[in-house]
From Swiss-Prot:
Gene name in the database record: atpH
Lineage start: Bacteria, Pseudomonadati, Pseudomonadota, Alphaproteobacteria, Candidatus Pelagibacterales
Assembly information from the UniProt record: F-type ATPases have 2 components, F(1) - the catalytic core - and F(0) - the membrane proton channel. F(1) has five subunits: alpha(3), beta(3), gamma(1), delta(1), epsilon(1). F(0) has three main subunits: a(1), b(2) and c(10-14). The alpha and beta chains form an alternating ring which encloses part of the gamma chain. F(1) is attached to F(0) by a central stalk formed by the gamma and epsilon chains, while a peripheral stalk is formed by the delta and b chains.
Protein name per its UniProtKB record: ATP synthase subunit delta
Ion transport is among the record's keywords: yes
Entry GO terms, CC: plasma membrane; proton-transporting ATP synthase complex
Organism: Pelagibacter ubique (strain HTCC1062)
InterPro entries per the UniProt record, alphabetical: ATP_synth_OSCP/delta_N_sf, ATPase_OSCP/dsu
Keywords: ATP synthesis, Cell inner membrane, Cell membrane, CF(1), Hydrogen ion transport, Ion transport, Membrane, Transport
Amino acid sequence: MSKNKGFSETSAGRYSLALYELAVEANNLNEIEVHSASIINLITSSEDFKSLIKDPTNNKEDQLNALSKISEQYKLNELLTKFLSFLISKRRFFYVDKILKSFVETCSVKRGELKAELTSAKDLTENEINNIKEELTKNFSSKIKLNYKHDASLIGGLIVQVGSTMVDTSIKNKLQQIENRMIEA
């Protein structure tokens, strides 16, 4: 029996793998991946949609009506819409964020991509981001899927994380290290 009584990563993985296999079979993988990312962004950006998903008092009909409207507005792939309807009918829509994130991650892994996080103190141009991505691709001998964030609190420098490897050249980190040495002394 599972120690985790909640909806586990394994369960999310099963649903996402099922969606992946259906998408491959229907030859719509790229479209469904893009639409899944759109749904993830909608969950992040819309408090109303997040509430509809997370509030257990919302009934299936309300969720299905909202899904229908979202499907029309975003012109979602029919297979993805049916999959999301299935989640609603099985009372698993509460976990749609985990499931779709797992699906997008599965797509990346199947393409042989490594996920990388880049955070910089200054806004980087598209060209600078692409140059960093190319260097990471060379260094890790793998295709890189790069997520970029700007964080002025770093003061200067970059933080790059690929898998479990992290390089932090930020001034904020250097100041923190100096502070720690002074406390220890």
